[in-house]
């Protein structure tokens, strides 16, 4: 008979004896437990607002399905962004072991890292547009900013952030040498975004560009995106018509230059034809002298001298002919360029005129106030924004202009903003190249070493609304987009380019921006009216989500999530603003007085 000590157990077990205490370790089914309990609640919130359904409705990926549906793999990656996973490899550790979390996001189970990467590499520009449709649909339904009255200006900050890669990298598309702060000889991509800060914390969208690109190259696309999300600002038809007339006048000037170049080409051809005729005469004379030298050997020497004279003149004509041909080619290129500029200006004038005459439906405009750094403070940008009806405060592009303006300000005109900064209105001066009268506010900053530097602000805000000092302080409030850059770069890890494919990286960028807005909406829905109202997204992702929870289904129509009572975030979430259990979903109503400071 077999000894009981030799019987194999059906349950794996390990023990450790320490003095009189035995520590026992076994394996058990933990499918009901998750370590990110509030991420479960976010999955339910996403289901409520239709986020998974929107992905399945708008995005169509043709990929052979073996274990996972392609959209399920895309949603798995999206959840990893919300969870703050820095790399796709984190999915296997942070998400895949928790089936209850997957079910909260309407997924049978989370896909693995390899499956997610395969789907990301299959994305095309059509899929990027489809993800943009998901973004637009959810933004229209859930945006906090869009609930503001249309006559209250929405403050939109625009900025660019560099996504650096290794200088030796050759496999990241669009990764080029460019300007990246605090580094030299760096490669990467440029990410430009439009962001609404204050109590909203919503990114309207953004674009990727090669490392050498400037934000001015992306500004037309950003303006189109802003108006798509928020509707158009009230356009200034009179300014647009004036702009169209200026463009038409410039087009006529370029057309006149093109006609002048073409006339010069005709003149050069006439001169060339005359020189060629003279060159033929000299060639004929040389041929005749050569024949006479053969017939009259005694006069060959004198004939050779005359022949050399004709040959020298022939060489001179040929040199002039080559110079004329080069001049004709240069004039032809200039004429082509003038015609191209003429066509472009006429097309732009036509578009501006159409925009000026296009009727705007009542109630479809919104006041939009743009803030931007010196990258946007060019004459063309200022003119464009003014004509399209935007309010704006921009930092001037050229510091030399600031130094020139400093000579025009009297000592009594300076107003103190703080102990290191003073400002003054520059009266009677226009921005060079801009046909409109705008406010120029000169700022003088003194650092700790008593070094003085100047910059200036350009704005169309009336001085009655924002005084000199108030305008400077208002511009300095654009630090909110700097905080956004840190969050999307270092919390949602947009800086970690997941692939070398630009299309996949573009799709990742869109989903990261959508994840940012979803976190903002979730924070408002979960914590409005609680001590954690206005919780920073960094704190929410890195601390707030990390609540141990158990998910059960006591009834087919009841899902219960038990959150750890030791977590203050769980306590605030469950208690709700009225301190009652079973708090229904909060309406997304913007409260401009948050209880907590935001990063």
Question: What is the meaning of each model-derived region?
Answer:
Residues 58-65, 467-475, 491-507, 523-536, ...:
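Short, solvent-exposed helix-loop connector elements
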Residues 45, 91, 96, 376, ...:
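Short amphipathic alpha-helical "interface-anchor" segments enriched in bulky aromatics
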Residues 243, 518-599:
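A short, flexible helix-boundary coil/loop motif
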Residues 64-143, 149-151, 196-203, 213, ...:
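Short, positively charged, Gly/Tyr-enriched micro-motifs
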Residues 11-21, 25, 234, 238, ...:
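An anionic, glycine-rich sequence signature occurring as long contiguous blocks
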Residues 32-76:
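Basic, short loop/linker segments at the boundary and entry of helix-turn-helix/winged-helix-like folds
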């Amino acid at each position: 008979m077999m000894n009981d000590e030799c019987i194999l157990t059906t349950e794996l077990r390990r023990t450790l004896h320490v003095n009189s205490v035995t520590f026992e370790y076994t394996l058990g089914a933990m499918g009901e437990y998750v370590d990110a309990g509030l991420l479960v609640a976010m999955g339910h919130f996403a289901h409520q607002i239709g986020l998974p359904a929107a992905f399945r409705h708008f995005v169509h990926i043709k990929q052979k399905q073996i274990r996972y549906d392609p959209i399920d793999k895309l949603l798995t990656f999206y959840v990893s962004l919300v969870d703050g996973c820095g790399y796709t490899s984190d999915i296997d550790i942070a998400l895949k072991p928790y089936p209850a979390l997957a079910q909260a996001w309407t997924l049978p189970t989370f896909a693995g890292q390899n499956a997610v990467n395969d789907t990301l590499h299959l994305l095309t520009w059509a899929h990027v547009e489809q993800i943009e449709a998901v973004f637009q649909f959810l933004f229209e339904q859930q945006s906090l900013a869009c609930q503001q009255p249309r006559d209250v200006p929405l403050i939109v900050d625009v900025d660019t952030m560099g996504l650096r890669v290794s200088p030796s990298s050759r496999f990241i598309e669009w990764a080029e040498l460019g300007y990246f702060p605090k580094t030299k000889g760096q490669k990467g991509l440029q990410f430009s975004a439009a962001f609404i800060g204050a109590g909203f914390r919503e990114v309207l969208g953004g674009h990727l560009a090669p490392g050498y690109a400037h934000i001015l190259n992306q500004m037309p696309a950003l303006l189109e995106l802003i108006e798509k999300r928020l509707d158009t600002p009230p356009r200034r038809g009179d300014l647009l018509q004036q702009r169209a007339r200026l463009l038409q006048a410039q087009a006529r000037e370029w057309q006149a230059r093109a006609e002048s170049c073409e006339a010069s080409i005709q003149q050069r051809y006439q001169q060339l034809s005359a020189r060629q005729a003279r060159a033929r005469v000299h060639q004929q004379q040389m041929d005749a002298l050569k024949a006479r030298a053969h017939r009259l050997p005694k006069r060959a020497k004198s004939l050779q001298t005359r022949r050399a004279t004709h040959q020298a003149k022939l060489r001179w004509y040929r040199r002039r002919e080559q110079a004329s041909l080069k001049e004709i080619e240069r004039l032809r290129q200039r004429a082509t360029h003038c015609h191209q500029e003429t066509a472009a200006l006429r097309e732009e004038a036509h578009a501006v005129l159409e925009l000026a005459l296009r009727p705007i439906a009542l109630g479809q405009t919104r006041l939009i106030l743009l803030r931007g750094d010196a990258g946007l403070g060019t004459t063309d940008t200022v003119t464009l924004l003014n004509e399209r009806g935007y309010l704006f405060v921009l930092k001037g592009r050229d510091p030399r202009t600031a130094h020139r303006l400093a000579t025009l300000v009297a000592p009594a005109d300076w107003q103190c903003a703080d102990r290191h900064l003073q400002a003054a209105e520059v009266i009677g001066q226009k921005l060079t190249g801009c046909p409109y009268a705008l406010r120029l506010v000169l700022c003088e900053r003194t650092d700790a070493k008593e070094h003085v530097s100047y910059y200036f602000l350009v704005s169309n805000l009336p001085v009655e609304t924002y005084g000199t000092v108030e305008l400077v302080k208002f511009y300095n409030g654009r630090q909110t987009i700097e905080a956004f850059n840190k969050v999307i770069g270092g919390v949602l890890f947009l800086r970690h380019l997941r692939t070398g494919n630009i299309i996949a990286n573009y799709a990742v960028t869109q989903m990261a921006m959508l994840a940012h807005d979803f976190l903002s909406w979730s924070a408002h829905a979960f914590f409005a009216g609680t001590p954690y109202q206005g919780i920073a997204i960094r704190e929410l992702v890195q601390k707030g989500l990390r609540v141990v929870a158990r998910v059960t289904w006591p009834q087919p129509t009841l899902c219960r999530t038990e959150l750890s009572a030791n977590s203050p975030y769980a306590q605030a979430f469950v208690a709700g603003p009225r301190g009652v259990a079973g708090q229904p979903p909060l309406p997304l109503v913007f409260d401009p007085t948050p209880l907590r400071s935001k990063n």
